[in-house]
């Protein structure tokens, strides 16, 4: 089969998505390929007020205009083969590249010290990014040998880019600046997962393991040294083992499980291993759920613990020079968030009610602090909270059918308790 899809989006600008798919099937063989072109523009207007209390109180009032232009080429090719109704294998190779990726940032800043105007700045930053081809390879096998179910998949991912930033800064009270910066980033990830399931005591028992290895190289250079240059490297090994048992009983269905996770993180700066920022730790996370029916009401209660890894962007060692009073930076030492979730859901006809409580450890937040103790420069970056972040949410939704119409209404509230001493 063959399929062509073209999408046109009109707002302040024009966005385009063009995609072609081809597919061939014969007996148990399924072969496929895809090619896609994306043209996207992004515009943002933001007003930001920042206050830094040091020897004096620094107030920054920024007006930012950001324009982003991207063109992406994506493609994949692969095959699936079904030996019989219980056993199949597959492989897919994906590639992605960007012939054009540039952005422009215009910033107008008013700077005050102890309530008196200290300076006014006009900044223009032009960024050009040369993206390397991103490669991803995935292979899987799902099958059954007797009563034993097997699910295996493996992935490899590679990406990288070279970005050059040029900033021109005009000051009413101080010298003007030209800032030249470059970032060279390379990412590699390999992962594999195996799950084995077998019927036990009228239920199903599953065991498995997962392995993930991540390598990242991140070099940043500022020619004028307004922002410190840096060369860093990160290696992370994650090994997970898990087990789960599920069964239906007279009063409902339940699932009991646990996951063991071992993480080893090594951080290098200028090819030297940094012991204080490297770490390894072990954790065990349980999960349990139970669902049943009480009359016409379906209900479920569950408890899970999940980890959320910080993105490559947050882990970046690169810096963004906004102006001489504001610098944005990544944080390569961010830890994964660990969230404990307790949820209850009930549904009756077209009504659904849900209550949830979350407790997040190492929550990632956006943070500002002095770049140096005696300087009036704000360093903006993501950090891990040193205390747990509790959150409660409650939602009710209705989706009744009225004639030919299906209406949906949702009401909810989310409440968090967090106090930060500054």
Locate predicted features.
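Membrane-proximal, glycine/serine-rich, low-complexity loop/turn segments characteristic
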Residues: 1-108, 126-160, 186, 190, ...
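Extracellular loop and loop/strand-boundary signature of outer-membrane beta-barrel proteins
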Residues: 5-7, 58-65, 120-127, 174-182, ...
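Flexible, surface-exposed loop regions and adjacent strand-edge segments
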Residues: 48-56, 106-116, 167-175, 222-228, ...
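Surface-exposed, low-complexity loop segments enriched in small/polar and acidic residues
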Residues: 98-123, 136, 151-184, 209-227
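Extended amphipathic alpha-helical scaffold segments
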Residues: 165, 264-266, 412-413
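Outer membrane beta-barrel strand-and-loop segments of large Gram-negative receptors
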Residues: 189-193, 230, 234, 238-240, ...
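Signature of Gram-negative outer-membrane beta-barrel scaffolds
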Residues: 206-293, 302
């Amino acid at each position: 089969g063959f399929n062509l899809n073209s999408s046109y989006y009109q707002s302040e600008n024009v966005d385009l998505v063009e995609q072609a798919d081809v597919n061939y099937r014969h007996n148990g063989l399924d072969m496929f390929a895809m090619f896609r072109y994306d043209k996207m523009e992004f515009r943002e207007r933001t007003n930001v007020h920042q206050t830094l209390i040091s020897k004096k109180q620094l107030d920054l009032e920024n007006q930012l205009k950001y324009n982003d232009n991207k063109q992406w080429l994506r493609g994949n090719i692969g095959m699936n083969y079904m030996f019989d109704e219980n056993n199949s294998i597959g492989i897919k190779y994906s590639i992605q590249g960007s012939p054009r990726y540039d952005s422009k940032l215009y910033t107008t800043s008013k700077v005050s010290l102890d309530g008196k105007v200290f300076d006014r700045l006009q900044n223009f930053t032009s960024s050009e990014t040369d993206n390397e081809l991103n490669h991803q390879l995935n292979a899987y096998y799902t099958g059954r040998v007797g009563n034993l179910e097997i699910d295996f998949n493996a992935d490899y991912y590679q990406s990288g880019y070279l970005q050059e930033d040029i900033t021109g800064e005009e000051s009413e009270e101080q010298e003007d600046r030209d800032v030249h910066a470059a970032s060279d980033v390379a990412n590699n990830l390999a992962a594999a997962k195996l799950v084995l399931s077998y019927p036990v005591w009228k239920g199903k028992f599953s065991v498995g393991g997962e392995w993930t290895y991540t390598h990242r190289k991140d070099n940043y250079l500022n020619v004028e040294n307004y922002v410190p240059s840096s060369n860093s490297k990160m290696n992370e090994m994650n090994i997970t083992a898990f087990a789960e048992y599920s069964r239906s009983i007279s009063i409902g269905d339940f699932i009991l499980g646990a996951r063991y996770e071992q993480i080893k993180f090594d951080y290098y700066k200028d090819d030297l291993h940094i012991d204080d920022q490297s770490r390894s730790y072990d954790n065990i996370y349980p999960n349990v759920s139970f669902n049943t029916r009480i009359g016409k009401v379906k209900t479920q209660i569950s408890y899970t613990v999940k980890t959320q890894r910080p993105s490559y962007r947050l882990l970046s060692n690169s810096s963004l020079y906004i102006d001489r009073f504001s610098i944005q930076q990544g944080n390569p030492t961010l830890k994964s968030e660990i969230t404990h979730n307790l949820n209850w859901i009930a549904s009756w006809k077209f009504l659904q009610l849900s209550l949830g409580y979350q407790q997040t450890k190492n929550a990632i937040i956006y943070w500002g602090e002095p770049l140096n103790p005696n300087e009036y420069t704000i360093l903006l970056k993501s950090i891990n909270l040193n205390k747990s972040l509790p959150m409660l949410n409650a939602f009710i939704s209705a989706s009744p059918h009225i004639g030919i119409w299906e209406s949906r209404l949702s009401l909810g509230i989310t409440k968090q308790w967090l106090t930060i001493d500054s």
